[in-house]
Amino acid sequence: MSNLNYDFSIVGGGIVGLATAYKLQIKYPNLKILVLEKESKLAQHQTGRNSGVLHSGLYYKPNSLKANNCVKGREQLVNYAIENNINHDVCGKIVVAVNEVQCDYLNKLKINGEKNSLSGLQILNKKEFQSIEPYADGVSALWVPQSGIINYEEVTNSLAKNIVSVNKKSKILTKCKLLNYSNQNLQTNRGDFFSKHIIFCGGLFSDRLASSEVKSLDLQIVGFRGDYFKLKNSAKHMVKNLIYPVPNPKFPFLGVHFTRMINGDIECGPNAVFTFKREGYKKTDFNLKDTLQALSFSGTRKLFINNWKFGLNEY
């Protein structure tokens, strides 16, 4: 039975779950840690389905938790990548303004970034930013040298490897679905486990996991899918690194951007469209429970009423 007893159990095998487990294992090397992931491989959802960008912390409110986590997290991630020979590139990005109104917002972004400890930010004229991205067009651009690219699935798998190298008694279990839990007991399709502490890092199902503990939880995850286009090989030369638009301050999205992936591909995206299945990645994916729960939530209705025109354009 001792093999089924753990000090910490992490539910969720994305980068948040593995980073949490790794930090705990490094700080407390003698503790036994268990990571449970329902898929056959780690990092198969949000972690492995994004632009792969090392974000600088440019946009977030100064001194906020989000800003501090982004800046410190990026620095730690780059150091981890260097120490563990993970392919990455701190290549910088440009945020391009296409009119004078956006130029004013660009200056505000620069000030905001500097308050978040970003150095080397520069407002560039057209000639200057086209020396970085020759095919970009606009009035001016903000150069952000701290931005970069990485493969987060690779990072996640590296974290998993390092956890078990620190403590051979720790385990990373895939194809392991949580069926039920109470107090310190976890029931899964791969057996039952006892854990002194349980940490949920359940991604798109975090609210459902939390609601079983916090009955009065008034928050809910509403799923949005992002679609990407991949540039043809003949067009790859048109994007050197990262090209972003000036974001619309009314919405929590950075806008459709061009990204050089760490494998050399160039992607354009994402948009943001309501999805009828939480972990649905195709336009036709549908789950009745997910859909009804999202549409019955007052926050979803408010979002749709206030932003229906923007939403239609995303399709």
Question: What do the PLM-derived regions correspond to, one by one?
Answer:
Residues 16, 41, 205:
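Conserved Rossmann-like nucleotide-cofactor binding loop
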Residues 19, 181, 188-286:
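Flavin-dependent oxidoreductases
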Residues 43-73, 83-88, 128, 275-313:
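Glycine-rich active-site loop/strand segments that organize a redox cofactor
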Residues 52-128, 138, 255-256, 265, ...:
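Dinucleotide-binding Rossmann-like beta1-alpha1 core, especially the glycine-rich loop
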Residues 142-197, 201-208:
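Helical element adjacent to the flavin cofactor pocket in flavoenzyme catalytic cores
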